[in-house]
């Protein structure tokens, strides 16, 4: 043994070949600060070996290196810029030393090599991979850019276009694509990986492969003519501006950095990467996006713990076909859980099967599946007008019309047709679960399972615990949702549960703005362009359906009369009374016409202004700041109330539900992260300016208390240790 650290070791093989093996405690390898330091110590040893002829890098884990240790990021990002820059310089000196070894080097890459893992293997001369490879640089999704030389080596290895596509989008690619673009040099079966890598290494050692020529382009300026460079970087900047926009500075910073470094050698280019990385790491956007990553890990770990003692449902059923039922059936079947889809109407069953077939055909068109797979999946969806097959299902989700009487009747009837241990769930969006459970003989086997539309795209499933719901029922439904590829978040019962309960105060803020003379177009523009929502409130209402919102608003008002009962006729009422239901009938705040792809495209409709004039004060202008405050305060206050009342268990789960269920702008990190970024005291000052608007603007007592003590909702992270200490960790 030449060297042994906590996360890697170095040993001799034969013929002067050394083997550096990543083998951290736990299930995965991460390129954390300690591992970077340990890699440096291993290189200290290697550089002294006069008989070294070649170096193999490999992993003892199922994945090579899954990336940096994201849990370290928040503390690293709090250190002063100069200190962070010094540590990056140290880390890059380690990878440069690996790249500059006077012998050929190869990485045997299995499974994941992401972020720092990818940057590590880029420093070796050759890369041999297994078919399960996922390799790439996802840093821009975390609000930063590659910091261990990825923005320097990848363009010089692949060419500007392929590298820009991976780095700017934060992409990873599979084995076939990596081989095609030159990111790896070969793909072999897992059992042949080590021997295959050693064979390539010996070819390089024997002179059959020119490893020095392979290494040289990574040390030199990017080989691009002025015209090629202008085209590549202009196109990349245009694409980034279109997709990322101003709220996500990392992708455009990465592109500009690669462009500026294109005519520089490795050392000078790394200096530019360092200078670009450090300011990004100190942005609110980076903290928010890293926070989302950590919250996502927390939510998934919680679901895994919750389901460890239950068996994932093997057969499921959906009550109610149509678009929603068909979407749920597709998602279950697509992920390997056969499903019975029942309705009382042939027409609805046809609609549900058509929806499932349409989604599968899209997968076929994209090359994700072949015709055989399509036929196999669709055959696991059994449409029926009867209860045939219900005796073998483990879980049933009801997705019929949002009417408590209808839902109760359907659920009670279904309960009599299934096994005593079968779990029933309702896809209701607002009706309290305990109310629906009142007609059931086994309420402990019943819970809410709120999917979001479109089911195949929206990651969130709210799992709602009623008064009598058992832990086993919750665990089974969470297991099914996880199997379907969704992110389940468990919430307690109340009207609207969590997501809709906090959405309708936001809509109420919008209605009050329109009542006071705001133009809905301006409000939408501000909330989209300035705050960052994917849709403004008017557009969102049109997509949800004005009739759906009108009904849900009444349910929420009955549930929370003190805050959500309004004493005036609003824009939603006016449009509803005029039969303008949004996209579903082509008329809402906008008029809709299908484009060439069959997607509804919004157009101005002057008739709306005269309709809204009856429920509004004369038009007046509002500042962007006032629009954002009046829209967001009601939502944030309600989010805080949900935490205080135990409807949602933690700030992390609340923020993930908002991001995954409503499209809350990820660069804000969710309501609690946004609150912490603003500061509770500053938020209280802002909210108090609008408390005259009514109870929705009254800040909850717990938040007032936080403001008094200047406390945050997330645990406060301490800055990382000084860079000198990090070096020798």
UniProtKB/Swiss-Prot annotation:
Residue ranges, annotated region (3-hydroxyacyl-CoA dehydrogenase): 311-729
Assigned GO CC terms: fatty acid beta-oxidation multienzyme complex
Keyword Glycoprotein: no
Residue sites binding NAD(+) per the record: 324, 343, 400-402, 407, 429, 453
Active site per UniProt: 450
GO molecular function: 3-hydroxybutyryl-CoA epimerase activity; delta(3)-delta(2)-enoyl-CoA isomerase activity; enoyl-CoA hydratase activity; long-chain-3-hydroxyacyl-CoA dehydrogenase activity; NAD+ binding
Presence of the UniProt keyword Lipid metabolism in the record: yes
Alphabetic keyword roster: Fatty acid metabolism, Isomerase, Lipid degradation, Lipid metabolism, Lyase, Multifunctional enzyme, NAD, Oxidoreductase
Pathway field: Lipid metabolism; fatty acid beta-oxidation
Record Pfam families: 3HCDH, 3HCDH_N, ECH_1
InterPro entries according to UniProt: 3-OHacyl-CoA_DH_CS, 3-OHacyl-CoA_DH_NAD-bd, 3HC_DH_C, 6-PGluconate_DH-like_C_sf, ClpP/crotonase-like_dom_sf, Enoyl-CoA_hyd/isom_CS, Enoyl-CoA_hydra/iso, FA_oxidation_alpha_subunit
Region annotation (Enoyl-CoA hydratase/isomerase) ranges: 1-189
UniProt similarity note: In the N-terminal section; belongs to the enoyl-CoA hydratase/isomerase family.
Description of how the protein assembles with itself and partners: Heterotetramer of two alpha chains (FadB) and two beta chains (FadA).
Protein purpose: Involved in the aerobic and anaerobic degradation of long-chain fatty acids via beta-oxidation cycle. Catalyzes the formation of 3-oxoacyl-CoA from enoyl-CoA via L-3-hydroxyacyl-CoA. It can also use D-3-hydroxyacyl-CoA and cis-3-enoyl-CoA as substrate.
Protein name as it appears in the record: Fatty acid oxidation complex subunit alpha
Native organism: Klebsiella pneumoniae subsp. pneumoniae (strain ATCC 700721 / MGH 78578)
Encoding gene per record: fadB
